[in-house]
Amino acid sequence: MIDALDGQPAFLEFTYVTNPGAAWSLFSDYPEALTLLASFALISIFLFRKQLELERHVLQIVFGLIGGGIAGNLGDRLFREPDEVVDFIDVYLPLINYDYPIFNIADSAIFIGAIVYLIIGFTDPKTKPNP
């Protein structure tokens, strides 16, 4: 990942790789289990949408990001051989000289949705117990 202009690593590149595992290739020996887990997660979000308070607009966005990311990676697993997702976003962090693991847009959606959900959980007065 070297920029042709100045010989320095580029901040962002697109690199095609496939990944049978989850984030950072975790559980790459169990792609079928990840497919089942993703299916279960999508079905659970749909079945428990009332309990998840999905009538609230911000939570619709959050679970839209999470569900869309899960669906995107699940689509790759179901329709690509052999049960792998395509990752292509390659980010280099020059300040700490770190080449972040390659990921995709679905991974980003899941991550952003989960972070926003945690922030809501810690800051939303509806989630705080009544004294």
Regions found by a protein language model. Give the residues of each.
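Alpha-helical transmembrane bundles and membrane-interface segments of multipass inner-membrane proteins
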Residues: M1-P131
